[in-house]
Amino acid sequence: MTASSTASASQPGRLRIAMLGTRGVPARYGGFETAIEEVGRRLADRGHRVLVYSRNPEPGTPLPRTYRGMRVAELPALKKRSLETLSHTALSVRHLLPRVHPDVAIVFNSANSPFLPALRAARIPVATHVDGLEWRRGKWGPTGRRYYRAAEALAVRYSDALIADAQGIADYYAEEFEADTDLIAYGAPRVDVGTDRLAELGLQSGGFHLVVARFEIENHVDVIVDGYVRSGARLPLVVVGSAPYANEYTARIEQLADARVRLLGGVWDQELLDQLYAGALVYYHGHSVGGTNPSLLRAIGAGAAVDAFDVSFNREVLDDAGRYWATAADVAALVDSAEADPDAQVLRGNLSRERAALYDWDQVTDRYEALCRRLAEQGPRRRRPSGRRTGAFPA
């Protein structure tokens, strides 16, 4: 086993838990935010005092002071890709140390690890959710990749626990740093929706292919669009997604698209998005470096047949319920085969729901709660892994 196990039973006693390092709640963007909302509200329901540090996408409208039982601390951030997360986390730590002093802090994203020594100096037990292999993301240049590799080492050195959301991530930290992790995946919502709102987009159930992804190179939206365009598809490809700092990549996707491709941009209406997942003939998932992906979990929770980029993280979630691709030619062949046998896609969607049942938010919360109790009882660790790399995964 590369990941240490955590107990599943709730115990009495209230904890003060701070969650920081993300855009916070309400969840609008990304897996971390979804996890914080789903886990944080359940922890609050169990009597814990949960504080979430949040950024506001609409500065003219203040965030609520409380949300689904959680307290919300709204703080600003620099609007620059390389500094937005770090600047917000710096302010969060500055706010937390003199005012809050929680029993446990959960820091999301290993990029925030330069702030861990300050938390440790204040004797606050801290767990770091390390996310995926950020240094492999195509959007980062050499400096960014070096930073993320250094940040991983700091997270290993200064965290009292590391959280991995996929076995592949746990294996990476075990092999590269000889460090244990707590393996806690995300939950998959059970999505049972109608199809009435598809008409707003001129769509009908089973009558379109779907992509939902942030426009980043490692999510392979361009490969999916390219493969679809090469196919003989009659049904449209609906593309949901955007990115605030990806104009060049967005332009490439637009250039690859033909008249059958419908680029919707971001869709923040969750009911409509769920109907898109549930109504798609096939959902194409191109994420490759981020561990267990919430978009994939939401898709299988809606009963979507899934064709996914062939990496261990996606196979871990889908197993035999998925089909897999690596190139645009692969995508083209899968598109054509899906349209040739739509009944088979319905059966694959049923298999997706069976896989989704393995990812339960209540059980996820059990594991977070057990981890927080363990850290609060043990306090900061005196002996920690060194953070030195074994060289198993060279840059």
Q: Language-model features: where?
A:
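Conserved donor-binding/catalytic core segment of Leloir-type glycosyltransferases
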Residues: 18, 200-219, 225-230, 238
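A charged, aromatic-enriched C-terminal amphipathic alpha-helix characteristic of glycosyltransferases
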Residues: 46, 343-381
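An aromatic- and histidine-rich active-site surface loop
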Residues: 86-98, 102-131, 135, 291
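Membrane-proximal helix-turn-helix segments that form the acceptor-binding/catalytic region
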Residues: 144-162
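Nucleotide-activated donor-binding/catalytic signature segment of Leloir-type glycosyltransferases, i.e.
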Residues: 250-271
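Short hydrophobic beta-strand element within catalytic cores of glycosyltransferases
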Residues: 282, 301-308
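Aromatic "clamp/platform" in nucleotide-sugar-dependent glycosyltransferases that forms part
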Residues: 287-288
